[in-house]
């Protein structure tokens, strides 16, 4: 079974990967236990259901990702640099997963949210909360860039919503078409929406 001490962690890591590379509905508890090398009885020691595991896993993954965003979007980083770093980060992550799995995976939260929005209200609420927090990082950078006279965006919240929705839509299309070029197009579109120079990323 592997060490009981890290079984809970392995279960959470496993469901995140299986949901992202596949779907929430197609993944069974047996699938999760097999890939995580954890016995089914141990699963129920830690979690009451697949939904409970997914909630815990999303929360943990968000805490980890939030640390990366805190660094990327630190107020000590110039606002346009924050946005460029984020563009580069998104492309890098999608490129790495394409190399690893053969597929562009897009945004795990959007894919999962679209799938379970009418079926798992607690999961749906968690996803909405995380997406709202992610959008706030863009909003803060846009607000600071406008205040510095670097872009014209007097309504930072509205601009952030537009930008966030555009980028997530592009990532979803990239997943559907399995085309990394669409992720790069999202970077170009982001820069056009903000009126800033496009960062150079590896193709």
Q: Model-predicted segments: where are they?
A:
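Helix-turn-helix
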Residues: 10, 18-60
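Amphipathic C-terminal alpha-helical segment
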Residues: 93-97, 118-119, 144, 164-181, ...
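N-terminal intrinsically disordered/low-complexity leader segments
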Residues: 1-6, 152, 200-203
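Hydrophobic alpha-helical connector segments
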Residues: 56, 70-105, 160-163
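Amphipathic alpha-helical packing segments from all-alpha helical-bundle domains
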Residues: 81, 85, 104, 120-146
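Amphipathic alpha-helical segments used for helix-helix packing
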Residues: 98-122
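Hydrophobic alpha-helical segments that form the core
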Residues: 105-111, 154-173, 189-192
